[in-house]
């Protein structure tokens, strides 16, 4: 059992009072309870809007407006919405358990018209956990939400996997999808269907018996039998067409002779003139073509000479440019040679200065050492001289002081004081407080010993310091060498750096030694590279002259080819004379042959026309006479076979027609007698009961009932028994089955179903095994399916029969054509084509003439080729020795490699030259760098301390010496004593002064000598430094000059530069000789061009004269050709045999045809006028216009439905074949198309009977319905009396009215309307046409009257009218009618939707408070029995124990209006009250 689809919920978003509210719908009844204005009608309006979003239909009015035709401007929808985006959606689960959300987006449109914009959409595949409000709104706060726009809704839904969103621009598409998914019960194809559905919903919503529905119950309940109407319309159209075609055939037969005569004479008249003009035009064109060929040849020769001129000019320009480049290169090479020579001289200077600089460097280093030693000695001598001077000065001062004291008496006291001071100074210096003048001498010995020790210690330290200074100077020297070579390095890394420098020194020396060999190798490779470049330039020039690129390895093969070409060209020149004589002889023979073939061509062309016509008609390639004879025999055999096959097809078609007639019987009765027997027995054919069985179930029921499927179902077999006694007109086997036709099922048999078969237990000892038929015929669907196949087969057989009949007649006519051909043309038809031979001979003649004309040109070309080949061989002789050089691809790489090696070697040589001496000095000092004498500073400090100690000891000893020396002053007691002592002292002082002066003199002399020597050394050093700096600066300048020269000055540079200059000089000489040669050739070419231009001007003048004549005639001829081709008559007019007739013969032929045509078109004014205009000989196009007018006239008279061509000539052929056959076939077809009035009556009667049975079945579902005093509701179906009479007359008395149905002037519909008027003369048909009335009479619905009846109280069955019923009874009765309509729609649409879909059923009822409790209970029961959902609205909860009830209360809070909703499930379900959901604002 298929589960019926259900509406799960209704969701309103942004409606008045409903921001986001979802109403869960009960499976049976959903009640909306609330006071006035609570929002019940708004909720229902939202549901209806989502169901039928058609603004032309929607009109939500109050029940007080029921029946009103006009309401408020917005029809009740605009005021129910709030500003912004609004939604109304329905959540549906169909029979396939698919969840579908269908709904609409509504939005108020600004303006005074209060319009609303509606956009329907669907969402499929949404998970059940997601509620509609979740996808329609977006939460933006704790108690706030935002309504999504339709685009945002689409984007959010499409982001979910497996969910589909679809928006509709058409309500039809929206309803089509809803029907396919089982949401609505009927396919709403048009606005009329939508209107019916809306009226149904509206009637349900407002309750009561809707007059809009009861008045048109036939449209709601009875399906339109469009198939029957269309069949009648197609049949009548076919009859009309058939009669028109027959009439056209009769007209066309009378035109056939006129076609033949008119086409034949018009063709002769126009074709003769057409071919005459064509011949004349060809003669003029041939003359023009001869001149044009000469003109084109001259132009070609001129173009060739101009091309040669351009090429030579270009080559001359290239040679001139190359000469300029070569002169520039030659000058550059000469300059380069001068630079190389200058650089060589510069290099010699540099080498000379470098040797001088090396010698100066060595001498400068030696002189530096000498100056350093002299400087040390000078410093010692200066120190000694200074000490001597100091000692002399001191002695002199002492002596001066003493003598001065002698002059003054107080000198003694001064000396005594000086002695005391000297004693105190000695005590302080010697730190001897106990020192006295007496013991001073003893202490003097002690301190002199100390001084001796300090001096010895100082000497030892000085020796050590000198050794350390030597080591330190070596380290510093080595370190400075490393820095000068490698740049700044740390002292700790000096040894490692020096070791690396010395390790790399041998390899750099080796590289430096390779400079000269590498220079020689590079010079050699560069010379080869230049030679290769020159060879490539020669190859490029050679390829340019040859016009083709060659590879070096191809040159030898090319040389052999050129040599063979030279030989061939020399031979071809010798053969030219003999070839010229042969061509002239052949040209004469061709002219004679062409004359012979021209005489034979017309006869052969006539035979070929006949042969090609035979080939086209027979479809065979007739290549010889034997094939013609064989083909004629095959035609006889084909005619016999085709005739036999045509008769077989006719028999098969008759059999199919009989089968179609049998299957077309109403109610599926294959035997028409069964219908009469069923009416006689008061039963129903079993096939009629199962008429609605589906195509899939037809094989099962066909096998189930077996032979009894053609039986009759009767209510009681005993009542039939007596009627069987005298029964004669019946089938051999008649099956009668007892059962109720209204509720018949297949339970009368015990059945076991097998694979594609059934076993039926007829009795205990009798079983029947029946297989499913391959082609079931049980049920209307199966019969219609079989009939469709039979109709297609019959159509194909009819087409095949027509084709075969045409082929038979065509074969007969073709046989006659073969007979005529054999008698007239067989002798010459299969000869060779003279025109083809003439064309070949003309082609050959043209070739020979062109060959003769081109002979000299070819000789000249051969001579040019000979010269070019010789030049090519000469160039190849120069190139071939250079092939190996051209193939050396590695030469440039090797030059680059050697260049890199030379650069590296030169860098090494420069390094050795710059740092070689330093590396030589550094090598023996490498070990010194391993250890840095770090104690040198400490030793210096010790030395300084020893010096201090020694100086202090000297000072102490000197102080003691002074005390000892002044010891006498301590004894000055008197003057005499003092003088004596002073005299001794004076002598000593003078003695010491003499010694000191002598020492000073020696020191001064020695200092002067050393100073002169030191000055001499410094002068030598300065001279050396000056010479060194001058030579170094000069060397830098020379090196910079060499760099500025930019030339590599090696041993072979000058030889290479000189060789390069000589090569360029030779190339320049060759180029100049070639340029002179080109200038001579260019002069000769210009003279030749002048001669050709004179000849060309003469040819152009002659050609333009003759071409002007051709062009003058061409304008009319082009118009003629355009008309001929545009109208497709070229094949008729261009008759090749006429091309061999002269102009007089063609004029005679045209004049004879003109006379015949004047008589033929005498009765046709248009053709007569056109013919008269065509007689103008100066306007040939008018003859073509006449021919086209004749064709157009005949083409317009061809019946395209009979003859399958628009060519009158072919039409004549087809007319004679088709006319007889079509006349016979169409007459037979008209007889078959004629409709039996009895069959029409049976079809309409059976259709009425089937619909009566269907309505009885619908009535059974309403038998138990009761509302108030109404105990039952039913639908009564009656046939109108006048229409019933018409059916009786059609079936029983049709012979009396055959004057209507056999008339060729009336269609069947018109005849039916005339019969209806004849039977009912009292009826006024108004202004309607008989055709319209007849079409209405073919619609079975117009035969029926439908009435709704109720069984009410004591009145019994009476017509249901609102005035006779209470409000509740009227509502219940109307609801029952609506349920019946919905059921009828579902049955009617069952074939259109999927088998696994059972559509949703839902109706509305507003203001349900008008029903009492019993009526409400009846509604609940009706919903439960019919699986229907119902939404009702009432001010109070009318049935809380069942269904789902929503309590609606409209409230206003802070100027915001909202509806408070509380849901309540029925008590019977024992489900707690649904929680109240606060409204989101």
Swiss-Prot record:
- Lineage of the organism: Bacteria, Pseudomonadati, Pseudomonadota, Gammaproteobacteria, Enterobacterales
Q: What is the name attached to this protein's record?
A: Chromosome partition protein MukB
Coiled-coil stretches noted in the UniProt entry, renumbered to this chain: 338-480, 509-604, 780-805, 835-1116, 1210-1265
Q: Which organism is it from?
A: Yersinia enterocolitica serotype O:8 / biotype 1B (strain NCTC 13174 / 8081)
Region feature (Flexible hinge): 666-783
Q: How does it assemble?
A: Homodimerization via its hinge domain. Binds to DNA via its C-terminal region. Interacts, and probably forms a ternary complex, with MukE and MukF via its C-terminal region. The complex formation is stimulated by calcium or magnesium. Interacts with tubulin-related protein FtsZ.
Which controlled-vocabulary keywords does the entry list?
ATP-binding, Cell cycle, Cell division, Chromosome partition, Coiled coil, Cytoplasm, DNA condensation, DNA-binding, Nucleotide-binding
* Domain of life per record: Bacteria
* Any one Gene Ontology molecular-function term assigned to this protein's record: ATP binding
What is the similarity comment for this entry?
Belongs to the SMC family. MukB subfamily.
The record's annotation in Gene3D superfamilies points to: 1.10.287.1490, 1.20.58.850, 3.40.1140.10, Immunoglobulin FC, subunit C (1.20.5.420), MukB, hinge domain (3.30.70.3500)
**Binding residues for ATP:** 34-41
Q: What does this protein do?
A: Plays a central role in chromosome condensation, segregation and cell cycle progression. Functions as a homodimer, which is essential for chromosome partition. Involved in negative DNA supercoiling in vivo, and by this means organize and compact chromosomes. May achieve or facilitate chromosome segregation by condensation DNA from both sides of a centrally located replisome during cell division.
Any Pfam family matching the protein: MukB
What residue range is the signal peptide?
none
The UniProt comment on domains reads: The hinge domain, which separates the large intramolecular coiled coil regions, allows the homodimerization, forming a V-shaped homodimer.
């Amino acid at each position: 059992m298929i589960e019926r689809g259900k509406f799960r919920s209704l969701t309103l978003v942004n409606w008045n009072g409903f921001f986001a509210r979802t109403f869960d719908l009960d499976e049976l009844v959903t009640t909306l309870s609330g006071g006035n204005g609570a929002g019940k009608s708004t909720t229902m309006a939202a549901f209806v809007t989502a169901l039928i979003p058609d603004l032309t239909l929607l009109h939500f009015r109050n029940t007080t407006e029921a029946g009103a035709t006009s309401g408020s401007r917005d029809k009740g929808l605009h005021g129910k919405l709030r500003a912004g985006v609004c939604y109304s959606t329905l959540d549906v689960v169909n029979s396939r358990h698919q969840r579908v959300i269908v709904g609409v987006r509504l939005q108020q449109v600004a303006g005074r018209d209060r319009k609303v914009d509606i956009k329907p959409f669907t969402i499929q595949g949404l998970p059940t956990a997601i509620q509609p409000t979740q996808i329609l709104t977006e939460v933006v706060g704790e108690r706030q939400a935002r309504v999504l726009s339709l685009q945002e809704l689409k984007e959010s839904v499409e982001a979910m996997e497996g969910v589909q969103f679809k928006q509709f621009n058409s309500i039809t598409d929206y309803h089509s999808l809803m029907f396919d998914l089982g949401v609505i019960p009927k396919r709403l194809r048009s606005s009329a269907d939508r209107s019916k559905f809306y009226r149904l919903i509206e009637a349900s919503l407002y309750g009561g018996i809707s007059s809009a529905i009861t008045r048109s119950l036939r449209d709601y309940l009875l399906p339109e039998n469009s198939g029957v109407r269309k069949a009648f319309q197609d049949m009548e159209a076919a009859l009309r067409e058939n009669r028109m075609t027959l009439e056209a055939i009769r007209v066309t037969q009378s035109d056939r002779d006129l076609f033949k005569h008119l086409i034949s004479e018009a063709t002769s008249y126009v074709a003769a003139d057409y071919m005459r003009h064509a011949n004349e035009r060809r003669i003029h064109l041939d003359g023009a073509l001869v001149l044009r060929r000469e003109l084109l040849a001259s132009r070609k020769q001129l173009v060739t000479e101009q091309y040669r001129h351009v090429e030579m000019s270009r080559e001359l320009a290239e040679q001139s440019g190359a000469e300029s480049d070569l002169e520039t290169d030659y000058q550059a090479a000469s300059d380069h040679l001068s630079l190389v020579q200058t650089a060589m001289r510069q290099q010699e200077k540099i080498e000379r200065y470098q040797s001088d600089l090396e010698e100066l460097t060595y001498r400068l280093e030696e002189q530096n050492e000498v100056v350093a030693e002299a400087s040390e000695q000078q410093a010692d001598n200066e120190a000694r001289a200074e000490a001597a001077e100091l000692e002399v000065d001191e002695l002199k001062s002492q002596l001066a002081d003493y003598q001065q004291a002698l002059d003054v008496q107080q000198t003694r006291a001064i000396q005594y004081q000086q002695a005391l001071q000297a004693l105190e100074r000695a005590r302080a210096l010697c730190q001897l407080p106990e020192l006295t003048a007496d013991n001073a001498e003893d202490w003097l010995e002690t301190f002199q010993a100390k001084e001796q020790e300090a001096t010895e210690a100082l000497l030892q330290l000085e020796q050590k310091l000198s050794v350390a200074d030597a080591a330190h100077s070596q380290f510093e020297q080595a370190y400075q060498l490393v820095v000068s070579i490698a740049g700044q390095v740390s002292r700790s890394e000096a040894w490692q750096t020096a070791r690396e420098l010395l390790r790399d020194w041998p390899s750099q020396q080796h590289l430096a030694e390779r400079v000269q060999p590498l220079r020689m190798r590079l010079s050699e490779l560069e010379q080869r590279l230049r030679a290769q470049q020159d060879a490539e330039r020669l190859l490029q020039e050679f390829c340019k002259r040859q016009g083709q690129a060659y590879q070096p390895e191809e040159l030898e093969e090319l040389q052999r080819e050129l040599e063979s070409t030279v030989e061939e060209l020399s031979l071809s020149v010798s053969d030219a004379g003999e070839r010229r004589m042969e061509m002239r002889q052949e040209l004469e023979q061709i002219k004679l042959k062409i004359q012979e073939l021209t005489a034979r061509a017309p006869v052969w062309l006539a035979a070929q026309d006949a042969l090609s016509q035979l080939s086209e008609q027979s479809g065979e390639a007739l290549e010889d006479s034997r094939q013609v004879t064989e083909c004629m025999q095959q035609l006889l055999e084909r005619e016999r076979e085709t005739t036999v096959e045509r008769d077989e097809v006719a028999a098969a078609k008759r059999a199919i027609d009989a089968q179609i007639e049998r299957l077309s019987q109403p109610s599926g009765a294959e035997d028409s007698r069964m219908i009469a027997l069923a009416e006689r027995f008061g039963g129903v054919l079993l096939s009629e009961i199962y008429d609605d069985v589906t195509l899939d179930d037809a094989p099962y029921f066909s096998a189930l009932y077996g032979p009894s499927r053609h039986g009759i179902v009767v209510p009681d077999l005993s009542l039939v028994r007596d009627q069987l006694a005298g029964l004669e007109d019946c089938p051999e086997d008649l099956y009668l089955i007892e059962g109720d036709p209204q509720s018949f099922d297949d339970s009368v048999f015990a059945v076991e179903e097998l694979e594609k078969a059934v076993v039926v237990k007829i009795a205990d000892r009798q079983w029947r095994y029946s297989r499913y038929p391959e082609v079931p015929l049980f049920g209307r669907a199966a019969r219609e399916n079989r009939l469709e196949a039979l109709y297609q087969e019959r159509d194909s057989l009819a087409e095949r029969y027509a084709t075969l009949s045409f082929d038979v007649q065509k074969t007969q006519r073709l046989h006659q054509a073969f007979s005529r051909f054999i008698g007239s043309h067989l002798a010459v038809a299969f000869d060779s084509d003279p025109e083809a031979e003439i064309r070949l001979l003309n082609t050959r003649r043209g070739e020979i003439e062109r060959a003769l004309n081109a002979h000299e040109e070819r000789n000249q070309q051969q001579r040019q080729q000979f010269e070019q080949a010789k030049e090519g061989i000469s160039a190849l002789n120069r190139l071939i020795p250079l092939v190996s050089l051209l193939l050396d691809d590695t030469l440039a790489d090797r030059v680059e490699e050697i260049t890199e090696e030379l650069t590296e070697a030169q860098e090494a040589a420069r390094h050795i030259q710059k740092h070689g001496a330093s590396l030589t000095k550094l090598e023996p000092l490498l070990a010194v760098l391993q250890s840095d004498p770090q104690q040198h500073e400490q030793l210096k400090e010790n030395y300084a301390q020893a010096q201090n100690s020694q100086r202090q000891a000297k000072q102490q000893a000197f102080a003691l010496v002074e005390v000892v020396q002044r010891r006498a002053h301590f004894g000055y007691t008197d003057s005499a004593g003092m003088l004596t002592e002073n005299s001794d002292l004076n002598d000593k002082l003078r003695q010491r002064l003499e010694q000191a002066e002598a020492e000073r003199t020696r020191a001064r002399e020695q200092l002067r000598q050393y100073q002169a020597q030191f000055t001499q050394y410094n002068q030598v050093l300065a001279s050396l430094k000056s010479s060194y700096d001058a030579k170094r600066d000069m060397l830098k300048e020379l090196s910079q000059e060499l760099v500025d020269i930019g030339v590599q000055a090696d041993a072979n540079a000058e030889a290479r530069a000189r060789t390069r200059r000589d090569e360029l000089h030779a190339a320049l000489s060759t180029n100049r000789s070639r340029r002179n040669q080109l200038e001579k050739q260019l002069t000769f070419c210009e003279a030749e061009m002048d001669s050709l231009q004179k000849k060309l001007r003469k040819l152009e003048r002659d050609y333009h004269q003759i071409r002007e004549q051709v062009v003058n005639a061409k304008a009319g001829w082009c118009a003629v050709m355009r008309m001929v081709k545009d109208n497709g008559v070229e094949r008729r007019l261009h008759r090749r045999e006429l091309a061999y007739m002269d102009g007089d013969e063609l004029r005679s032929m045209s004049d004879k045809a003109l006379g015949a045509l004047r008589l033929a078109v005498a009765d046709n004014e248009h053709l007569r006028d056109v013919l008269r205009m065509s007689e103008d000989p100066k306007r040939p196009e008018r003859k073509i216009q006449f021919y086209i007018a004749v064709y157009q006239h005949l083409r317009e008279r061809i019946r395209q439905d009979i003859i399958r061509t628009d060519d009158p000539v072919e039409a004549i052929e087809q007319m004679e074949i088709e006319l007889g056959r079509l006349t016979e076939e169409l007459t037979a077809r008209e007889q078959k198309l004629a409709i039996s009035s009895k069959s029409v009556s049976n079809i309409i009667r059976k259709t009425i009977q089937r619909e009566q049975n269907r309505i009885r079945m619908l009535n059974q579902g309403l038998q138990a319905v009761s509302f108030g005093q109404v105990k039952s509701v039913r639908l009564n179906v009656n046939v109108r009396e006048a229409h019933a009479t018409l059916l009786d007359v059609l079936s029983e008395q049709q012979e009396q009215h055959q004057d209507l149905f056999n008339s060729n002037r009336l269609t069947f519909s018109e005849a039916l309307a005339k019969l209806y008027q004849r039977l009912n003369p009292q009826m006024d048909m108004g202004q309607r046409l008989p055709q319209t009335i007849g079409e209405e009479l073919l619609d079975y619905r117009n035969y029926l009257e439908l009435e709704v009846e109720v069984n009410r109280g004591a009145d019994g069955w009476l017509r249901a009218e609102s005035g006779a019923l209470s409000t509740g009874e009227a509502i219940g009765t109307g609801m029952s009618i609506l349920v019946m309509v919905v059921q009828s729609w579902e049955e009617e649409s069952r074939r259109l939707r999927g088998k696994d879909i059972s559509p949703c059923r839902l109706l509305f009822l507003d203001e349900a408070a008008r029903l009492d409790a019993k009526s409400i209970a009846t509604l609940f029961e009706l919903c439960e029995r019919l699986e229907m959902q119902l939404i009702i609205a009432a001010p109070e909860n009318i049935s809380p124990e069942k269904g789902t009830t929503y309590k609606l209360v409209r409230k206003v809070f802070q100027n915001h209006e909202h509806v408070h909703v509380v849901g309540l499930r029925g008590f019977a379900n024992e489900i707690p009250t649904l929680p109240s959901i606060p409204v989101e604002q």
